[in-house]
Amino acid sequence: MSTSTSPAAMLLRRLRRLSWGSTAVQLFILTVVTFGLLAPLACHRLLHSYFYLRHWHLNQMSQEFLQQSLKEGEAALHYFEELPSANGSVPIVWQATPRPWLVITIITVDRQPGFHYVLQVVSQFHRLLQQCGPQCEGHQLFLCNVERSVSHFDAKLLSKYVPVANRYEGTEDDYGDDPSTNSFEKEKQDYVYCLESSLQTYNPDYVLMVEDDAVPEEQIFPVLEHLLRARFSEPHLRDALYLKLYHPERLQHYTNPEPMRILEWVGVGMLLGPLLTWIYMRFASRPGFSWPVMLFFSLYSMGLVELVGRHYFLELRRLSPSLYSVVPASQCCTPAMLFPAPAARRTLTYLSQVYCHKGFGKDMALYSLLRAKGERAYVVEPNLVKHIGLFSSLRYNFHPSLL
């Protein structure tokens, strides 16, 4: 007489037959240990990781960041107070270049007192230009002050060292009192003014528009030299409207839908999957090659890279300027934007045709123009500037946070 066996009982029998040496058991244990123990322990303080413990660390890290920014602001202030002014001996990088190859235009407003954001930005550019030497002789610093008030102390201080364009100099402007003009439209018009002033004053080959809370990374000039001299000679890059030098780290995950990122993510699995499979087969003394094991390690590596944070793996590209990637741009944000001169003139025309408002800032306006005008734009990865401004010039923020 035969007896029927339930599916649950059959499953239990099969599980009992599995030994610790079973491939399935080993890979299951590896998954649990990696994603349940090792990665959370190693990454719980990484700000842009899915393992980041926000409730434990965010407030403290935000306060530490603000305190460090205050110290760096004070250091930048002392730096300029001790630097010889235009009445004395001015370093060559501050002197006007007849027709520069690259104009670095820093747009500034009077921000939260004490942090001296614009001083931090300009002092870092000055230091990097000095280190760059003859290679950067065709670079020109240019400050564009769009603060309506005359009380912008940092801009006044910098005017001793850097050529300055003041949008509201010598005028009693009631621009902000016009009910039809909101802060987002004013920011766009300020941007247009600074871009146009850069072109009219210097007629350069390129204009780098930098907001006053975007500190350049150490590698910015070697990377720009490589990109503009070599990579942007390629036909599909040559006529780009702009090149973004910054994209928020929180938006750099693979799960933020960008076609090129998906291809990169699959490429990570295709690269690391076979490598980890070979390592596993070698150390586990498994004969031959297993497609299921390779599929597991491909998915394992893709999941690990995404959960730890794509941002941190992008940092490996800083080893060489040639490793930086250039991919199609998305809409956010504008801390640092590079315009070839012909594209800058097209941008001025385009921006004069749009009106910005809440929910449609200048970054979205620029991005919307790509499809409307048949233009292309790109972003370089990893970022070439650090965004240090936790206090927005558009929105009141009494409790600034890193996220």
Swiss-Prot record:
Organism annotation: Pongo abelii
Modification after translation: Glycosylated.
Protein name: GPI-N-acetylgalactosamine transferase PGAP4
DXD motif (motif): residue ranges: 211-213
Gene: PGAP4
Keyword line: Disulfide bond, Golgi apparatus, Membrane, Transferase, Transmembrane, Transmembrane helix
Cytoplasmic-facing ranges: 1-22, 281-287
Record: residues binding UDP-N-acetyl-alpha-D-galactosamine: V109, T334, P335, K362
Record note on domains: Contains three transmembrane domains, including a tandem transmembrane domain insertion into its glycosyltransferase-A fold. Transmembrane domain 1 functions as a signal for Golgi targeting. The conserved DXD motif is involved in enzyme activity.
Lumenal topological domain residue ranges: 44-259, 309-403
